[in-house]
Amino acid sequence: MRKMVLWLCLTAMLLAVGTPLVAQSPNFNNGPVWRVMYVNVKTGMIDQYWNDLKQNFRPLYDEYKKQGWIVDYKFYTNPVAEHPDDWNVALAIEYKNWGTMDEMAEKATTITEKHYGSHQAMVDAAKKRAEYSTLIRSSLAREVTLK
């Protein structure tokens, strides 16, 4: 019975270690992970949105960058909307790997609450932001390079 349990444990360990090896592609190398958020900012509110990004997003994500949780962040605009509710601003956040996303999720709340002054102030700012912008979609993508 002990041999069977030992064998099962070893098999489980080999499967756990071997899984990443199987996940490697012969076609590309894995790169960083990107989260892209597509936002629709209401007409006439774009300046308020950009000011919010400058006052809140940038200082927080610059600190996250210092902490090593993100590699970079970028903003994109959509010059050709397909319909009135289409996105007009996209925010892209680059993470070194999936693990840094988990690490950041666990630790960033403290920094975020400190920036806003309190948890309630953070919630109030999010409610205010929701008055002039809507998150259309949030996507995760792994950057890859061809071999």
Where are these regions (language model features)?
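Short, solvent-exposed mixed-charge patches
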Residues: 146-147
